[in-house]
């Protein structure tokens, strides 16, 4: 019998442990990049406008922003001018990709490990003043996000999801690791904290399995789906739609569930 955990009760990643959470994901991504052929670096991904190489450039840009928040501010300002039709965060991400545009794929792969090692070493010493800085993504209906939340929680899940993107683009199997559960549970906590739909039980299968209650009151339904597919949906990657099954209860919960989004 599956033990049901209230997602809200999952402990938030503490700043003191953020580097420990990030380290295994960096290792997993590094291993994947080391296996890619020249052709695979050019393959299109589920991220609009980006191929595999662009995703890696974006991830390197995340490392640069974590090490130098002022650079993030500068790129956001310049991105608003260069990409005026994009949301602020999307424009920032494009600026990071542009910054690595002239580098070869092999150079990106070589820079990945040392740059992220710097981030892992620097995280414990990040000051509260920097952690308290906020960034407006520009997405409708969303609040500014704190830098502390980004480095403690989002960096690991964003890289995890982009590892999924690369595997899907290249047809490679997504290699599972012990830290996957922690990444998934932080997403579900954020989902629960912002949830306004009917309470439900979410049963995940695949790379991470288990049961989590979303919402405070008695669940009206149990929804089952593949962990990777469900997290892709929460990130806004809506195609292909995950195969969701209402095990019992009110199937109307699927509407709110499919519309839910979590920051990545």
Where are these regions (language model features)?
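Globin-like tetrapyrrole-binding proteins
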Residues: 131
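Glycine/small-residue-rich hydrophobic helix-like segments
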Residues: 193-233
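Amphipathic, well-ordered alpha-helical segments in soluble domains
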Residues: 25-32, 62, 115, 158
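Short, helix-capping/interhelical loops that line the mouth of catalytic, cofactor-
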Residues: 1-17, 65-124, 134
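An N-terminal domain-cap segment
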Residues: 5-57, 66
